[in-house]
Structures are given as C-alpha cells and as structure tokens.
C-alpha cells in the first residue's frame, strides 16, 4: 500500500525538518524565541511528519494484515500527510493560513473514520503449514 511508503517518506522528512532548524535552535531569540508563533509552528510541522507518518504506517499495515482496502481513506491520509506540514509552515510566516488547519485535520479524521468502517467487517486469518486457516489470536506457536 502506498501509505507505508508515504510513512517512511514522512519519517525521513521529519528527520530533515528537525535537523535543519536544529542547527539554529541554540539561539534564544531565533525566530522570536522558544515560545514564538513561528517557532511553535515549525516544531508542529516537524512532529506532524512523524505523527501522520505513524498513522499512514498503521493504516497501510493494518490494511495489509486484514486484507482491507479503503482507497478513499488512503487518499485522505496521504492528503493529510502533505497538507498538515504545509499549513504549519505557511502559518508560521503568514498567520492567516492558520484558518486552513481544518483541511489536514478533517482529512486525517475522515480517513480514520472511513478506515474503521472498512475494517468493521474484516476478519483476519492465518494459514498454517497444512493450509488450515485459523484466527491469529488462537494460533499456537511452537518454540
């Protein structure tokens, strides 16, 4: 699923978006100081790469394990992964962009709701070496 790839790209961008500003964080007054609006929004953008990355990873892996596909949820989650840091960075330097936070927040929320709905009827089973299907929660593992 594309969401797994998007998750790892998000993790990479999270590392980069933390490392670059990290070169300047030692300056007490950098971007107006630690509690300034621009600095807080840059931190939020940085952490959003990881947070929404984990949501993408969860959606992709859960979908694979359960054999569930929810293309609309997938697209909405990808949209949220792109829109959230974009709105954060835009808002950091043009505060009027803060009014656009409903787009990534709504996108991610809708993705989760749709994915939960698609998982509702799914069942997960594991095939053993003899071809017998069983629930993974009731599978005995020999050590």
Please describe what each predicted stretch is:
Residues 1-46, 50-143:
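Polytopic transmembrane helical bundles with strong interfacial aromatic enrichment
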